[in-house]
Each structure stands twice: as C-alpha cells, then as structure tokens.
Amino acid sequence: DLHRGRLLVAASVLGDPNFVRTLVLLIEVNDEGALGVVLNRPTSTTVERALGGSVEIAAVPPPSVIFEGGPVGSDTLLGVSFCDGEPALVDLEHSWGVAGRFRLFAGYAGWGAEQLQDEIAGGSWYVVPGCEGDLLTEQPEELWRVVLARQIGIIRWLSTRPLDPEQN
C-alpha cells in the first residue's frame, strides 16, 4: 500500500548505485507518480554553511547537515517535517520557523506514473511503515538496519546481512 509516510527499503536486487541500502520516505504519491527523499545519506555540508543564518539551526536535529535526498534535482533544497503524523514539505522561504524540527535534503527521488509500482512488483523495494523518528534520527547511518530490524518475517533477517554477501 503506497501512500505518504511509507518507507521504501532498497532490496539487494536493486541495481541502481544511487539506492544501495537506502531508505526513501515517501512524501507524495498520486496518479502522476511518487516523490520521496533518502533518509540515510548525510553529506558533509552543514546546514549553517549552506544557508548561513537564514534557518534556525536548532530546528535541524543532529547531525545538522544537508542530506542527499536523491538523484533528481540535486540543486533543489527540500525541507521535510512531520505534521499530523505525515511527512510534509517545509516552505523554506516563508514558514520554516513554524515547521518544528525538520531535515534538509539536496535533491529527491522521483518516479513516473506506475514506475514505482513496477519496481516494487519486481522486488526492488520493500514497503514498510515509517515514523517521525526515522526522519529525525541522530544516527542516519544505522537507520537501514534499525528499520529492517523492527519488521517481522524475512525482511527482519535482512538487517543482519553484510553489504557484501561474500563476507557472510
């Protein structure tokens, strides 16, 4: 069931290097396609260095860096927060001060109509529930394992697999 707030967990069969062991938070899903951001790819660019004093740094939890949101529109900066239990884009020009805590992403992941559904049917993604803590985690490098470990069934077992299966 695809809808806003779900997480896409990259399966090992997904051949795109942009998405190896990634978690994508879906922000928008409609008949035209889907849009999301990668939650576990922090960059070394600090929010303060990128935006100066234009953003209240306290609203961006540690690590206070820009995240690589995906391969599309890498020159686009998106703010993402949770509002009423669902992820929402933050208007960085006008209303970021009322958004509460949020993350900043350079770029995003996008799919055309039916493209994501086809990738899921092909086994490229697992779809699992997401939560605000996933977006705001202070340990994004561990998030892929943490999200998998809280699932049930075989998907939980995947959290213990090494990046290179030959190291198993």
Predicted segments with their positions:
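A short aromatic-anchored loop/beta-hairpin motif
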Residues: 1-168
